[in-house]
Amino acid sequence: MTVVNLAYIPSPPQGVWHLGPIPIRAYALCIIAGIVAALIIGDRRWEQRGGERGVIYDIALWAVPFGLVGGRLYHVMTDWQTYFGAHGKGIGKAIAVWEGGLGIWGAVALGGVGAWIACRRRGIPLPAFADAIAPGIVLAQAIGRLGNYFNQELTGGPTTLPWGLELFYRRSADGTVDVLNLNGVSTGEVAQVVHPTFLYELLWNVLVFVLLIVVDRRFKIGHGRLFAMYVAAYCVGRFCVELMRVDPATQFGGIRVNSFTSTLVFVGAVAYILLAPKGREDPATLGGTPSSADGGDDTAETEATADTEDTEDTEDGVTDAPEADATDKSVDESADNSGIVEK
């Protein structure tokens, strides 16, 4: 008989539903919801800073796909044995991002490359964009952590604390029973009660979101320093959470790889905060250029045509003026010769 402590947090009975043959995964829905929230918040903040509304969505067309690819690459690279080891899941599972597994550092790094490309095309300073989107990113991470809750993953060791998370055995369609069965449905039997480390990180991310908003409003942070503050603050929380996690991960000297990454990135973020210019960018620099390269070329061509016409008019004026003077002089001479005088 299974004894259930009502004080514990129960896991969801399942993390995937089916709409006919199409699987609807809670993890994917959480990722999408996080991205939408980040874009809405980022767009409003960009407009408040003096930028054009809607620009954030244009940049996202580059940044989001790059970020998803980068996040998955980082996850696979730091968990190589799971996919390509002796008993690995294979390349099919390696690209199945909808089943969970995104590394934030890869997402930020490659997403930053996509954002840089888009900002360069629009003539927008990348640091200003990063500051506008930073609070939205950390909130998106918090929302995304809910996906780990549905997957019963990213947890810590056993605990008897009242906020411990109950992990249920799940049975898949083929009858397989396992705690980490992403496609299964709960049997109702509790396998163990553990630290919900994903929840700890979720709460930390929400706190960082609030702090970034408050600090930015009070001190008018710019030039990429607010984004660096987000990175530094996130690293602190991630480092602490990594110390509590017990799920399999690549380690160096008994330390999880994400702990090393968090430390190095934290140092870099703090250095940037100290060295970057103070204050905020001039709103006039956030206007950028039209999103369409063709539109920009048409504008330039129109201006060039106008300049050419002005030049031709000037040249015609210089050439025609002497001819007009000569004609007037000829008429005057004819009038004098004929004795005609105006009275």
From Swiss-Prot:
GO CC terms, sorted: plasma membrane
E.C. code: 2.5.1.145
Subcellular location: Cell membrane
Record field: compositional bias (Acidic residues): 295-325
Pfam family, one: LGT
Enzyme class: transferase
Membrane topology, from the record: Multi-pass membrane protein
Keyword annotations from UniProtKB, A to Z: Cell membrane, Membrane, Transferase, Transmembrane, Transmembrane helix
Pathway assigned to this chain's UniProt record: Protein modification; lipoprotein biosynthesis (diacylglyceryl transfer)
Transmembrane segments: 22-42, 54-74, 97-117, 123-143, 193-213, 257-277
Record has Protein biosynthesis as a keyword: no
Binding site for a 1,2-diacyl-sn-glycero-3-phospho-(1'-sn-glycerol): R145
PANTHER family associated with the record: PHOSPHATIDYLGLYCEROL--PROLIPOPROTEIN DIACYLGLYCERYL TRANSFERASE, PROLIPOPROTEIN DIACYLGLYCERYL TRANSFERASE
Family to which the UniProt record says this protein belongs: Belongs to the Lgt family.
Function summary: Catalyzes the transfer of the diacylglyceryl group from phosphatidylglycerol to the sulfhydryl group of the N-terminal cysteine of a prolipoprotein, the first step in the formation of mature lipoproteins.
Protein name listed in UniProt: Phosphatidylglycerol--prolipoprotein diacylglyceryl transferase
Source organism of the structure: Mycobacteroides abscessus (strain ATCC 19977 / DSM 44196 / CCUG 20993 / CIP 104536 / JCM 13569 / NCTC 13031 / TMC 1543 / L948) (Mycobacterium abscessus)
Gene that specifies this protein: lgt
